[in-house]
Amino acid sequence: MKGLVRLLTVFSLLLGCWGWLGTTQIAQAGSLQSFLVPQVPVLAIESQNRADAKLATEFGKKIDLNNTNVRAFQQYPGLYPTLARKIIQNAPYSKVEDVLDLPGLSDGQKQLLQSNFDKFTVTELEPAFNEGDDRFNNGIYR
């Protein structure tokens, strides 16, 4: 009798395990549309981070004395690297003319800055552009 119970137990276990080895059907999700109220699509504004929003303003067209890195001054002769470093080290500025109050500027440097006032702008400090040392070394090498 014990042998028959053992044999029946082993056979039942084998039969149960054999069912798991076969391929199972994919579970079909039921549709809840019949239970739910029809949904109306909502028009949403495309999300935009603060850095991209600032780039769409005057900041993207001129050099922002509070947020731009040193390399942006390369395109203007005489500003890179000495004046650019002084401008960035003494930021923030409330208006473009404040850059003339930098300590240790020569008359020639002041004239050079004045001649480039139309290329400068001042906006509020943006952490995305000022965190770490990105204003001095933004990691772009030629």
Swiss-Prot record:
Keywords: Electron transport, Membrane, Photosynthesis, Photosystem II, Signal, Thylakoid, Transport. PSII is composed of 1 copy each of membrane proteins PsbA, PsbB, PsbC, PsbD, PsbE, PsbF, PsbH, PsbI, PsbJ, PsbK, PsbL, PsbM, PsbT, PsbX, PsbY, PsbZ, Psb30/Ycf12, peripheral proteins PsbO, CyanoQ (PsbQ), PsbU, PsbV and a large number of cofactors. It forms dimeric complexes. One of the extrinsic, lumenal subunits of photosystem II (PSII). PSII is a light-driven water plastoquinone oxidoreductase, using light energy to abstract electrons from H(2)O, generating a proton gradient subsequently used for ATP formation. The extrinsic proteins stabilize the structure of photosystem II oxygen-evolving complex (OEC), the ion environment of oxygen evolution and protect the OEC against heat-induced inactivation. Its main location: membrane. GO terms for biological process: photosynthesis; photosystem II stabilization. It is found in: Cellular thylakoid membrane. InterPro entries: PSII_PsbU. One of its GO terms (cellular component) is photosystem II oxygen evolving complex. This is Photosystem II extrinsic protein U. It is a peripheral membrane protein. Belongs to the PsbU family. Residues 1-29 form the signal peptide. It comes from the Bacteria. The lineage of its organism: Bacteria, Bacillati, Cyanobacteriota, Cyanophyceae, Nostocales.
